[in-house]
Amino acid sequence: FFDRDSYEKTEDYIEFVDKAIGDNILTVTSPCFELWLILHYEAAVGKYVVPNKDMLFQNEKVSSSHTFASRLFSEISGSNPKSGSFFNKLKGGIDLAIEQEKVLEQDILKMATEIGSNVGALIEQMREDPRDEL
């Protein structure tokens, strides 16, 4: 699991994805994990993601303790995303986050230039019971 904004250059990100893809399941948030957290809130794509698309994608540092995305999450939730104190507030919103994620980019290569996440896809895969396929 990693954040796309860990790579400054698009080419470095794509090179990493090409190397890692193999049999692994790559879980990516673009620009960062705070996007996934924001998706736990009602109408998050329309209220928070779309209006802030460019600023979110760039995700620049806006203070000594926040990037744009972490500050946005803090404003929405009243919690610092690095503290973990938000977990109980968000755990009931996982299904909402999964559904909202589906309107964003889920292709990990396209996330080099688009806002997206495939965390929900991983959760859905983890929820599947392999015995159902027998």
Regions found by a protein language model. Name each.
Residues R4-L134:
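C-terminal accessory helical subdomains adjacent to catalytic cores in phosphodiester-
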